[in-house]
């Protein structure tokens, strides 16, 4: 039996599929990135994962249509939170974002000067809610686990 914190036994609870009301998935970028779910972008070092995500962030920041979308699928400009442990904002991230034509007021970073950020950090939720961010990029995600 799995224990919860403080060694309280976990109680078995089940739900039948017949008791679940199915709902539609909402998409940030159909069929690649759903809203409210973790999406991983995998590739070898140097494949351009960070550059791709910054290009998407730039398009979202302007409300421009994403690749493979219809031209009429542009929407409202969105705020994106970008966190990275591999590149500096001033010499890599912001120049790439600017080169992709992004709106610098809509790309934000959570400062980690005093405390490193982790995946479950309340500052992420606070930033998403306060700035109405629609996309959180953790590059690489493995640096934020723990």
What are these regions (language model features)?
Residues 34:
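Residues immediately N-terminal to the Walker A/P-loop in ABC ATPase nucleotide-binding domains
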Residues 59-77:
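Post-Walker A helix-loop "phosphate-sensing" segment adjacent to the P-loop in P-loop NTPases
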Residues 38:
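Walker A (P-loop) ATP-phosphate-binding motif of ABC ATPase nucleotide-binding domains
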Residues 4-9, 24, 28-30, 45-47, ...:
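Conserved inter-motif catalytic segment of the P-loop NTP-binding fold
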Residues 52, 56:
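Hydrophobic positions on the alpha1 helix immediately C-terminal to the Walker A/P-loop
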Residues 42:
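Residues at the beta-strand->loop junction immediately N-terminal to the Walker
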Residues 1-19:
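A short, basic N-terminal segment
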């Amino acid at each position: 039996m799995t224990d919860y914190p403080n060694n309280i036994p976990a109680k078995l609870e089940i739900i039948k599929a017949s008791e679940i009301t199915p709902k539609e998935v909402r998409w940030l970028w159909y069929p690649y990135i759903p809203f409210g779910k973790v999406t991983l972008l995998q590739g070898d070092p140097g494949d351009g994962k960070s550059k791709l995500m910054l290009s998407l962030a730039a398009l979202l920041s302007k409300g421009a249509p994403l690749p493979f979308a219809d031209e009429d699928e542009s929407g409202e400009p969105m705020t994106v939170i970008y966190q990275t442990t591999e590149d500096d904002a001033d010499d890599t991230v912001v120049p790439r974002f600017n080169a992709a034509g992004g709106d610098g007021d809509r790309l934000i970073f959570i400062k980690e000067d005093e405390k490193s950020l982790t995946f479950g950090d309340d500052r992420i939720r606070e930033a998403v809610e306060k700035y109405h961010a629609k996309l959180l990029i953790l590059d690489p995600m493995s640096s934020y686990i723990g």
